[in-house]
Amino acid sequence: DRSGLRSLDRGPGYVERQVGGWIGRYGRARTPDVGDFAATIAWLQANQPVERPPTMIHNDFRFDNLVLDRADPTRIVGVLDWELATVGDPILDLGSGLAYWCQADDPEDVQAIRLQPTNAPGMWTRDQVWTAYADARGITVSPTERLFAEVFGTFRLAGIAQQLHFSLLFALGLLLAFGGQGVQQLARLLEFALAGQDGGPQGLHREIVFSWRDALQPLLG
């Protein structure tokens, strides 16, 4: 209440809302080339833990949202990207962040999607992150709580990736709908719109228009 952020609190049911929300987002973004995650979805719906007392959470807490001290990289001096911040279960927030955390002994297929230097020498394992978090807060995180948080976090990450995949396919579909001839027509319309007083495209505008057209033509046929 003192922070003035009480409006972010939607009340009890945070875990249920998160699970249901990401099931819905994945379903809406699903394309024919991916699975339905039916077993994972059923498990998440059936194994939701008792919620802990809510706290202010970042909701996108991961390594590449941290600012480290240049002189001492083990010291965090800032946390970025608070636009998703809310009031909810911090265990779920940590599990979501650890979905990005590939450690040095993870198998090759996991290493292939690593985006952060979490496998570098000296970096903590996920076990060590959980232990440090529990010790810092003076709490015990049960194995079932941790498992649920990590499964949810991985499913959430799959949902994010699928949303991006869907957006890319949708954008490409719009481009393909124009066809090669459509690109030519759009280029001519742009030329006309950008024409100078002498009736011809100005030099820089002409370069932009034809660079755009030439870049798209190999994709559109």
Description of each model-found segment:
Residues Q181, D198-G199, D214-A215:
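Residues at flexible loop/coil and secondary-structure boundary positions
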Residues D1-A38, Q48-T55, L84-P90:
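A cross-family kinase active-site recognition segment
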Residues V183, I208-V209:
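Hydrophobic alpha-helical signal/anchor motif
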Residues L92-G138, F152-L168:
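Active-site activation/catalytic loop segments of kinase-like enzymes and analogous catalytic loops
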Residues A177, A187, A193-A195, P201, ...:
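Short linear motifs in low-complexity or flexible loops
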Residues L216-L220:
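Short, intrinsically disordered C-terminal tails of secreted or membrane-associated proteins
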Residues D9, V141-F152:
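All-alpha amphipathic helical-bundle segments outside canonical DNA-binding/catalytic cores
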Residues A42-L98:
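Active-site acidic catalytic loop and adjacent metal/ATP-binding pocket
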